[in-house]
């Protein structure tokens, strides 16, 4: 399955929180991610930039930020925080998505994505997509 197929049915993500953290070089093939518009994302990512995004479909909240420097964000859901770090190739080369010190990022090149259920923050799915080299945007676990 590829990234466009995965995010084609937005109703499935109604009560979910989608978290994205980029590592290394996420920009080369990102324009092929056509379903990003279904999620409300612009994904204006420069070469070797850091990038984070949070899509909270329950609350209708979308946040995204890209920059050459390391990006960090803590998103509060009820009494817990989702801590997100993205560092592009030249700013640390790292991806992290944590809840209560538990790591959910695959920490691989491209986009690292974790999806959580809104009520419990239980992990629904996690995967990565090599948006640097993989033109088909294949989901890898």
Model-identified regions with their sequence ranges:
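Short acidic-hydrophobic catalytic motif
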Residues: 1-141
């Amino acid at each position: 399955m590829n990234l466009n197929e995965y995010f084609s049915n937005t109703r499935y993500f109604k009560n979910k929180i989608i978290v994205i953290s980029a590592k290394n070089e996420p920009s080369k093939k990102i324009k092929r991610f056509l379903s990003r518009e279904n999620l409300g994302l612009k994904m204006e990512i420069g070469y070797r930039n850091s990038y984070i995004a949070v899509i909270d479909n329950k609350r209708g909240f979308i946040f995204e930020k890209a920059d050459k420097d390391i990006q960090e964000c803590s998103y509060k859901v009820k009494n817990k925080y989702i801590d997100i770090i993205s560092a592009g190739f030249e700013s640390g080369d790292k991806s992290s998505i944590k809840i209560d010190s538990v790591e959910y990022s695959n920490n691989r090149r491209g986009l690292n994505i974790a999806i959580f259920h809104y009520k419990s923050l239980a992990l629904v799915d996690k995967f990565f997509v090599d948006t640097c080299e993989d033109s088909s945007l294949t989901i890898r676990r």
